[in-house]
């Protein structure tokens, strides 16, 4: 299992929320976005969507940072999938990833 994390920040760089991927939890936003992206079977929470649903004040969200780590804990290349890209575009956020 690879660990993926996402951090949503405001314009000043303050952390608004942190999310991580889950192989057991889902959310209606994840299910809707997966359906719209043509991948309805990808219903388990992605880190980006987990971070977004945890933001208390969406109007302050400015950027999202995405990180992925291998089994040894080393950072590896990460980028939002097409499901998460759709939601990030809806939120009009800047994206930074490893």
Language-model features, listed with the residues they occupy:
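Zinc-dependent deaminase catalytic domain
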Residues: 1-98
